[in-house]
């Protein structure tokens, strides 16, 4: 329990440090590994969906723009009820060039970006439990039936955008590696539910 609370406190402290951290320092503290995985798609003129979980300090992943300057980074987020804290959070997340996108606007903006020919990486975090109206997809996880969010798969199939998985790994206190893995280059070729199972 002590390690958990220490990690939680570290995560909050690291989040507020993002207010003033320099570009060089955040690139040292959050190293992007296998960036050639999404880069190959960008060279083909294709946008990418990046999927990750709430693990480590995912907020540091917004520095990806420092590694891939010619691509628009669009992290999906759920607005916070407190407007002041919401604006502050968005400001931190956009410090290095990311364009945070409210969850409710996701599909509309992604469709518009695709129609306009913008090359983007749209970031999804997806390990939360679905609300009651979204309990459509179930799978076995840790030997029990588990409801899983399937919005990422639905959007990926609709837009047929390649999907990569980002594994955020804590190397030591305050230092992370965000490693990219290729999940699927052609989501429409998969059976329904297959892509969701891939990233669980």
Could you say what each language-model-derived stretch is?
Residues 2, 40-42, 68, 91, ...:
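Non-catalytic C-terminal accessory region of glycerolipid acyltransferases
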Residues 1-49, 56-57, 178-181:
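Membrane-proximal helical "anchor" segments flanking the first transmembrane region
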Residues 37, 61, 76, 88, ...:
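Short, hydrophobic/aromatic alpha-helical segments in well-folded domains
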Residues 8-11, 32-35, 60-63, 81-83, ...:
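Short hydrophobic/aromatic-rich motifs at helix boundaries and adjacent loops
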Residues 3, 7-10, 44-104, 131-140:
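Catalytic core of membrane glycerolipid acyltransferases/transacylases, capturing the structured
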């Amino acid at each position: 329990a002590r390690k958990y609370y220490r990690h939680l406190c570290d995560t909050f402290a690291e989040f507020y440090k993002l207010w003033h951290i320099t570009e060089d320092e955040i690139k040292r503290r959050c190293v992007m590994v296998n960036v050639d995985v999404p880069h190959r798609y960008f060279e083909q003129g294709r946008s990418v969906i990046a999927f990750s979980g709430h693990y480590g300090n995912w907020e540091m992943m917004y520095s990806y723009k420092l590694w891939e300057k010619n691509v628009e980074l669009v992290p999906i987020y759920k607005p916070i009820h407190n407007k002041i804290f919401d604006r502050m959070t968005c400001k931190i997340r956009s410090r290095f060039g990311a364009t945070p996108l409210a969850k409710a606007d996701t599909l509309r903006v992604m469709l518009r970006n695709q129609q306009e020919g913008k090359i983007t990486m749209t970031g999804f975090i997806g390990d939360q439990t679905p609300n009651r109206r979204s309990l459509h997809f179930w799978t076995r996880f840790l030997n029990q039936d588990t409801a899983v969010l399937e919005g990422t798969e639905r959007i990926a199939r609709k837009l047929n955008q390649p999907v990569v998985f980002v594994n955020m790994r804590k190397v030591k206190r305050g230092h992370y590696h965000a490693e990219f893995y290729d999940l699927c280059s052609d989501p429409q070729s998969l059976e329904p539910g297959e892509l969701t199972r891939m990233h669980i």
